[in-house]
Amino acid sequence: GDISYEYNKIENITNYLKILVDELHFNKVVCITNYTLKYGANYIVKNAIEYNVTRDELLIPEDLVKELKKCRNKRFIYIYFGILWEQRPSGHANMIIIDTVNKTIERYEPHGHSLIYDKKKNILKRIDSKFNSKLLNYIGLKNYTYISPVDISPKIGVQVKADAYNGMCVTYSLMYLQLRIMNPDVDQKDIVKYLLKKSRSEIYDIILRYAKYIEDKLKENSTKIIVHNDQLYTKTFQKIKKFVVINKRNEIDIIIY
């Protein structure tokens, strides 16, 4: 095709949501922000916060605060939340959803309470500590309530129950986001319970069909997406970007790339 669609391609979250918002007329419900996180020699991602497990650091684009202020008249704001290890070639995806009506900021973990290999929940505790102690205040949401993955899903989450092949965490996170957008007043736990009532094979089938649906939508809009991706990887990448780090001591540093 004209675009490189991959189920774990992070920029396709924003590309797909722009299509969804336009087609379903959700412009008053969802805010599509426009900021980037750039760090290292060649890493850039749109509308995201990242957690570096190796360094115990939370990476926040400086432009995030300004973009959130533009979204105060919308119900939902999404933030892709990436979990990275320096010694691994790939990471893991969560989804952050800000609900401006209920004054909440939730983090959805498709594995369940925490990463399936985070047996002692050390990663969960570190991330939640950074959210509660620093992040909410820094991004101007100190009066919001943080909803941890343990408050949304049982220990065994949707992705783990389905046992889908590695890399589908982006798609599971995006599916949860779409279900929240389309069912704004349904409790988060009920959305997860609805999916977990299904058998392993049913969940597996749902996520693969959903991934195919996203792929088809992206290919239908390939011309626009080529322009968006070119903007991200050429013009935007050349600009110097600042990002804020909440370090392992939960102190704030500012980094420039």
Q: What are the roles of these predicted feature ranges?
A:
Residues G1-M95, T100-I105:
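Cysteine protease catalytic domains with a Cys-His-Asp triad
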Residues E11-V21, V65-K69, L136, K189-K193, ...:
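Generic detector of well-ordered alpha-helical segments enriched in charged/polar residues
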Residues H25, D56, K103, K121-N122, ...:
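Intrinsic-disorder/low-complexity loop/linker signature
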Residues K142-F243:
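C-terminal folded domains that constitute the principal catalytic or ligand-binding module
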Residues I10-I13, P61-L64, K120, N132, ...:
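Short amphipathic alpha-helical segments that mediate assembly, nucleic-acid/protein binding
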Residues L24-K28, Y39, A48, N52, ...:
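Short, flexible coil/linker elements and helix-boundary hinge sites characteristic
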Residues C71-M182:
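Cysteine protease-like catalytic core of ubiquitin/ubiquitin-like
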